[in-house]
């Protein structure tokens, strides 16, 4: 059975005139196409009180919180993603957080972040048995992870790279699967587990 996943968007500006827009990277669309995934909608940065009706109308049963920007840079996005996480928690919906999205999942339960050096526009190993290297585009990392999460992967400098909730079907990673072509088999499974029930 397919699920409908709502994908968070980031604030972007029009070139040449003043207009705020909600957008996602085209890398996501390419990734979805390569995996034959078409059961998604974009989640514009609406007022939080509109979210439940929007999700009910579109039969949303999961969220993908994308990367981009630092938490607290776009307050409207922060509020909407917190509302989405509240809805997901109440209904036990699937959530996948990528980069900023993983930080948001941790923050939702009281986690904190801190700045980190050496994680922008680079690749580094994670501590899994395959000695996999992942891309890295972030300047913040999780500082204090709430007890309700377990760490799946860490980088060589001990930064948290991937987490999962101990009860809820929530997962997060700091790397960007949409930026690796072809997609790594591990990330392919991660995406399929979110988009297919």
Task: Label every model-predicted segment.
Residues 1-100, 114, 119-120, 127, ...:
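N-terminal beta1-alpha1 cap of cysteine-dependent amidohydrolase-like domains
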Residues 133-134, 171-175:
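Active-site-proximal beta-strand elements of phosphoester/diester hydrolases
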């Amino acid at each position: 059975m397919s699920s409908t996943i709502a994908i968070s968007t980031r604030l972007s500006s029009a070139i040449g005139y003043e207009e705020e827009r909600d957008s996602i990277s085209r890398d996501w669309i390419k990734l979805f196409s390569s995996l034959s995934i078409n059961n998604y909608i974009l989640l514009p940065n609406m007022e939080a009180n509109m979210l439940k009706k929007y999700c009910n109308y579109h039969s949303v049963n999961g969220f993908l919180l994308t990367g981009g920007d630092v938490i607290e840079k776009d307050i409207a996005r922060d509020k909407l993603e917190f509302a989405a996480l509240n809805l997901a928690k109440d209904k036990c919906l699937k959530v996948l957080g990528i980069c900023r999205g993983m930080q948001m999942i941790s923050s939702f339960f009281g986690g904190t972040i801190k700045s980190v050096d050496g994680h922008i526009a680079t690749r580094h190993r994670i501590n899994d048995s395959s000695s996999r290297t992942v891309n890295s585009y972030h300047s913040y990392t999780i500082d204090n992870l709430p007890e309700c999460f377990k760490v799946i992967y860490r980088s060589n400098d001990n930064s948290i790279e991937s987490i999962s909730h101990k009860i809820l079907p929530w997962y997060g990673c700091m790397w960007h699967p949409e930026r690796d072509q072809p997609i790594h088999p591990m990330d392919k499974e991660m995406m399929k587990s979110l988009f297919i029930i």
